[in-house]
Structures are given as structure tokens and as C-alpha cells.
Amino acid sequence: MKKILFLALLTAMLFSCSDSDNEPVGLKAIEVKAAVDEVNLWGNLVLDISKDSLYKVGYDNGDIVTISGGSLTKPLDMAFTDKMMSVGTWGMCLTYFSNEATLTIGLANASFSDRVGGKEGDILTISLKEKGGFRDVYERMKLWKTANRSDYDSDEMFANFYPVECHGMKSGVVYRSSDPLLESNNPARYEYADRFARNAGINAIISIADTEEDWQSAVEAGSGFGEYCNERYSKGALLFHKFNVDIFVDEQAAKVGRMLRAMIENNPPYLICCSMGRDRTGLISIILQVLAGTTYEEIESGYMRSYYNWHRLQPSSESYNDFLTRILHRTLYIM
């Protein structure tokens, strides 16, 4: 029953670009079968087919597809997009990532398997619902970013390093950034973030993207890790609390609780970081701001600053309100 209610809410609120009662528009692609190879760390469904399998039979980014079969309780309409966040927080999509060979069915910033369904071994059918039906949104939700320091205004901007600030919170207590720990998780920026952690006098570094095993492997290899992070590790002040972005699933919520308790067992200043320092770090920053007694304006300013630091997205940008409503406002509504 909870999943049925969730699907109804998801369709009504989060995916207004598709109406499952309408007749399919502009069908040119053929149906494709795919098996769920695994449910990944994020709770999303990893398929056994590549994006080229769809391109070759008429599908393209910006199409709306229907996924059906397996253990899914009903056919689901969603965008086919290579930019997962273009569907907004808790939006459904058929997507792919540059470092992965096959397609994924997922929820942006949430766990598809927990929220919607699906399991390993499911045989699913992919069919075309509307050719180009998501294209306008897809184009508006594109984000610019590079790995070149020279493309950014400052080292701080490039590292996405800045304080978490609001009413009720002393300045200089909590900072956030992209990953300062490992080159493998933040290739171009980790040394910048590590240097700013040192300059800010950070005592406790809380990573919500790395495991201690990954950290130890890099240290044993002798390269690819933050020097200041290593100093904090030797003092017992480099804390590993990796969790996925759906912090409202019981298992993940428990991990967040353990992270917050570990945080207050150490002295400030604190640095909270995930890979980009944007999504998971943004959620934790909102929680801390709310606990301190923040305002909406402070939440928006702090959360959207990461989008400026990474993507030069600012209030005057044409697509700013799209990201504000589809990402931040949905996140706050869910919280």
C-alpha cells in the first residue's frame, strides 16, 4: 500500500511532463527487453543492456519511456536521460553514467528499489511513450562544469569549500567541501579541499563518501590522498560514515544518526564532505541549519551555493528557478 501511494504521489507531483492516460506520441522505437543485473549501493536497478542498445533501435536522450514487467506493480513512465538530476529530486529516470557500461533505472537522490520496487533478476520491458517528450526539460536542466582550475574564479570555488552558516550557529564551526581525502573520488579538486581544511584549522573531518578501506589502500600505495586528512587520521579525527543520498530509508537514517553522534563526540571546527560536496553534504547541512534555527533564505543561499561553485548557476541564470524548485524545494518538502 505504501508503494502504491508513493507511486501516485510521484506521478502527480514529480513527473508532470508525462500523462500515462494519453496515447503514445510519435512512436518510432521498438520494445526492448532488459534484465536487472543488480540493485546497486544507491538502491537503483542496474540493467544488462547498454545505452547503445536503445540508440540503435530509435531511442534518444529526452524521450519518455515506459518500464514494465518483473516485480513492478504497474507500468512506469519516466525520462530517458544521461543527466539524472534533470528529473529533479525523487524523479524517476532511465539513465547511464560515463563510468558504467550499462543502463540504470533510478530515482534522483533516492532509492528506486526501496521507494518504487524492482529486484535482481527481474525481466523488464522498455517501450517508447513519447518521442522527445522530456527534451525541453532536459535542455533547461543541463549543467556546466569542468575539471580545470583556470575555469573557476578562485581556489575556494573550485574546491567547493565554504562555511555552513545560519542564525543560531557560530561562524567557523562547520564547513563543507568536495572530497579532500582521495584523488580517486575527486581527481582534480581533492588537494585544494585538503589545503583549505588545513587553512581553516579543521579538527574533525567527516567523510560521507569514502570508506576506511579505500583510504587505507591509498595511504599504503603512497599517493592519491590528502596530506592534512592523513594528519587528522593519525589523531583519530578522520571519520568515515559513508551513506547513500536517500537518508529517509531506515538503514540510511541510522547511519546519519551515527554520523551526527560521532561528530559531536569530537571538537570543532568540523568539515563535512562527500564526493562533490553538493548533494549528501547539502542534506546534512540543511539538517544542521534547521537544528540551529535557520531561515528558508539561509537554506537556499547555502544549498544553492554549491550549484554556483560547481556549475556557475546563480539567481540570474535562466534555469536557476528550475533547479531551485525541482531540487531544493522538493527536498525540503520531503524532509
Where are these regions (language model features)?
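C-terminal motif of bacterial Sec signal peptides marking the signal peptidase cleavage site
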Residues: 13-16
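Ser/Thr-glycine-rich phosphate-binding loops at phosphate-binding pockets of nucleotides
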Residues: 276, 280-281
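The Walker A (P-loop) glycine that initiates the GxxxxGKT/S ATP-binding motif of P-loop NTPases
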Residues: 272-274
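Positively charged n-region of N-terminal signal peptides that target proteins for export
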Residues: 1-4
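Cys-dependent protein tyrosine phosphatase-like superfamily
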Residues: 19-21, 109, 117-270, 283-335
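Long, compositionally biased stretches
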Residues: 23-109, 113-129
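Sec-dependent N-terminal signal peptides
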Residues: 6-9
